[in-house]
Amino acid sequence: MTEEFNESMINDIKEGDKVTGEVQQVEDKQVVVHINGGKFNGIIPISQLSTHHIDSPSEVVKEGDEVEAYVTKVEFDEENETGAYILSRRQLETEKSYSYLQEKLDNNEIIEAKVTEVVKGGLVVDVGQRGFVPASLISTDFIEDFSVFDGQTIRIKVEELDPENNRVILSRKAVEQEENDAKKDQLLQSLNEGDVIDGKVARLTQFGAFIDIGGVDGLVHVSELSHEHVQTPEEVVSIGQDVKVKIKSIDRDTERISLSIKDTLPTPFENIKGQFHENDDIEGVVVRLANFGAFVEIAPGVQGLVHISEIAHKHIGTPGEVLEPGQQVNVKILGIDEENERVSLSIKATLPNEDVVESDPSTTKAYLESEEEDNPTIGDMIGDKLKNLKL
């Protein structure tokens, strides 16, 4: 009889086989399972019931449940012709989990998992087994307190799998980066040169300010911060400040966006509309000399031209004979061209002269209407404030 029993055991279920069965009894430290096609019942110790820590088998199974497990050992008593299959449900769950996670890693897919524990180095998550999100892979942003994730279900990607060492490394940061890139691409496609949009000052450099316009940073060069001359960006804006910007150019391949705050603001000329009138006598400061005349600032950022013929009653060869930058002068407004933002001025009209000569109307008209290259333009009018606008 014993010989027949041993021979039947050879042909029966053996170690390493995968079996199924019905839970017959749930005890304190183990579960008894009726194995389909088996000669004996199976026993699953509590340590082999789940990939997670449990205090009681009843937390994961109940009588009547269908379970699947690996046979880790076959025990039998030859004398009494009885035996049992020692089973591991945990081993099978781990195998399935690694297979699932490997597929997600190969396909670069996102999964969802619940944070079961917050530890010093990161987050412990449930991915069918214990998975770990290191602190460096939690977010693209700095997060001071990781406890905000405790109990939350988060979206993550598989970063590294090492079944031999039971190591599962995951990344929430990779998901955030992917989502940010998608938003960035969508935003870049929606923007057009000339658009005026809202933004927030993200950081400042010597050469300008970077503005966050919804997930993408654009640069406002220092020359595009204001109509007035700016030495450093801090003179005009501060980090976190909400601003309106105009898109000057977009390079979608390099994701470089040039912006302007200045173009969203009234020009200095617009600010003085109604303040000055033709024939007004006002004070100004000589800011620049040219062969054809002198540029005089009559309001912040607004310069008018005193043609060389309007500088003095006597004939002069160059403006530098009687004027120098920084000199305060009295001027009379000869004409205002609001459309082209030009002001024609005269110094000699404010000076006494025994042989007063009327200002030559043709000179004023020539300046206000001139479009020739050698004649002053709006760039001449506000001088070096508009130089070097390239980003």
UniProtKB/Swiss-Prot annotation:
GO terms for cellular component: cytosolic small ribosomal subunit. Residues 16-90, 108-173, 194-262, 279-348 form the S1 motif domain. Keywords: Repeat, Ribonucleoprotein, Ribosomal protein, RNA-binding. GO terms for molecular function: mRNA binding; structural constituent of ribosome. Pfam families: S1. Belongs to the bacterial ribosomal protein bS1 family. This is Small ribosomal subunit protein bS1.
